[in-house]
UniProtKB/Swiss-Prot annotation:
It comes from Shigella flexneri. The keyword Iron-sulfur does not apply. Keywords: Cell inner membrane, Cell membrane, Membrane, Transmembrane, Transmembrane helix. Its main location: membrane. Pathway: Bacterial outer membrane biogenesis; enterobacterial common antigen biosynthesis. This is Probable ECA polymerase. Probably part of a complex composed of WzxE, WzyE and WzzE. It is a multi-pass membrane protein. It comes from the Bacteria. The keyword Methyltransferase does not apply. It is found in: Cell inner membrane.
Length: 450
């Protein structure tokens, strides 16, 4: 890449970054937080944060990259995607009418809410316990990170339930919403994330998500400022780099350490070059249609229920890894959101996907606002826990693609909804047995005086 080519790419990158950052800043000033703000920051991180890192790798370490015209296509496709997404998100689908009291779809009380977070936490802890009994601490047993996807590791399906510890702790926080509950959320979820990091063998997702939710709650409540958020972001990047070194068993120093930091940070937070590799092989792609979305559900179907279930699922990430890159190392390489749309239907699917994503984020913000307006604090805690708990799925959406997001968000909704139903059933059983006694002001006063 020549300096002239780099200069042209830099101008496009700067314009796209300023365009997205400006719209995000205006939205932040208006509402402080919503899921449009979160997705916009996530989109910036995924498709634009990596450009400066790639530039340093090219000019400082002479690392090879895709041709400049391909990198230009990546930047332009990301900028156009966001423009279509933003217009879709801001488009009002129906006229605003005065709030009319409606019969709520469901209600929650104190016992049901506490039962819900206990069940969610129980699912996570039991799953971790069973996985640990089968495999021990994989971080200290395996020689390479790719081995966690091999047949040596049993009970891999249990990892999908680990994440429900975070929604459980979110319910606990939203029931109190003070600084102590906020700090308790951070300590408990990060400790759990470190435990799963050691047990699973290097998976950092739970730590990243817990830290991100902690920061966004702090921004919403005004407990941290923007400069503190930026400082925490830098600390998070350094922390993720250190965990990556431990995961891959690397011991580096000097120029090698700087080089390793650049490419690991780029691959962790901004896999934009993966989209460049995909576009570079555009003519070799056999468009998959909506099949990757259907196939991604296969992993949630037990083999005893479907004996003939394919052992290898050809979703967009695996198609990109196996068919496009001819990489059979055992690791699936993230195609990114735009890349998954290209695998499914080529360039035509990019604006269509942007419209779909705009509607998805609009729906989550509708739920979030519903929780903000809810007068029942227990129902509000459940709604907010569900919305913030889905942040992991939004990260999957930006990094892995639309197909991975759809299957995971459906799984999340089913499990979360099942926990709600079980909590309500248990409450009904306890109440029928006479074990539930409603609190009264007189009984509370007696307890205080006693």
């Amino acid at each position: 890449m020549s300096l002239l080519q780099f200069s042209g790419l830099f101008v496009v990158w700067l314009l796209c970054t300023l365009f997205i950052a400006t719209l995000t800043w205006f939205e932040f000033r208006r509402v402080r937080f919503n899921f449009n703000v979160f997705f916009s920051l996530l989109f910036l991180l995924t498709f634009f944060f990596g450009f400066p890192l790639t530039s340093v790798l090219v000019f400082r370490f002479d690392v090879g990259v895709a041709p400049p015209e391909i990198l230009l296509q990546v930047l332009l496709s990301a900028g156009c995607f966001y423009a279509v997404y933003y217009v879709t998100y801001k488009t009002r689908l129906r006229k605003r009418v005065a709030d009319v009291p409606r019969r709520p779809l469901f209600t929650m009380n104190r016992v049901e809410t506490n039962l819900t977070w206990v069940i969610l936490m129980g699912i996570a802890l039991v799953s971790v316990g069973i996985f640990f009994m089968h495999n021990g601490f994989l971080l200290f047993r395996l020689n390479s990170y790719s081995q966690i996807f091999s047949s040596e590791v049993s009970g891999v399906a249990l990892k999908r339930f680990f994440y429900f510890f975070i929604p459980a702790m979110l319910v606990v926080y939203f029931l109190r919403q003070d600084s102590k509950a906020w700090l308790f959320f951070l300590v408990s979820t990060v400790a759990f994330g470190l435990l799963t990091y050691m047990i699973v063998g290097g998976t950092r997702a739970n730590i990243i998500i817990a830290f991100a939710i902690f920061l966004f709650i702090g921004i919403i409540r005004g407990w941290i400022s923007l400069w503190m958020l930026a400082a925490a972001g830098v600390l998070g990047i350094v922390g993720m780099f250190w965990l990556a070194l431990k995961r891959y068993g690397m011991n580096v120093s000097g120029d090698e350490a700087f080089y390793t930091f650049l490419y690991l940070t780029r691959d962790t937070f901004s896999p934009w070059e993966n989209l460049a590799l995909l576009l570079q092989n555009y003519d070799n792609i056999d468009f998959q249609g909506l099949a990757p979305i259907v196939r991604d559900f296969y992993v949630f179907i037990p083999s005893w229920l479907w004996p003939g279930r394919p052992s290898m699922v050809l979703n967009s990430a695996n198609y990109f890894t196996w068919e496009v890159l001819n990489n059979h190392s055992g690791l699936a390489i993230s195609p990114t959101l735009i890349g998954s749309l290209v695998v499914m239907g080529g360039a035509l699917f990019i604006p269509l996907g942007a419209i779909v994503v705009g509607l998805i984020i609009k729906w989550f913000d509708w739920l979030y606002e519903l929780g903000n307006r809810e007068t029942n604090r227990y129902k509000a805690a459940i709604l907010h826990s569900f919305c913030f708990g889905a942040i992991f799925n939004m990260i999957v959406l930006a990094r892995e693609g639309l197909d991975s997001f759809v299957s995971r968000v459906v799984f999340f909704i089913v499990v979360f909804g099942a926990c709600l139903m079980i909590a309500k059933l248990l409450y009904w059983l306890f109440e029928s047995a006479g074990l539930i006694h409603k609190r009264t002001k007189s009984s509370l006063r007696t307890q205080v005086e006693g």
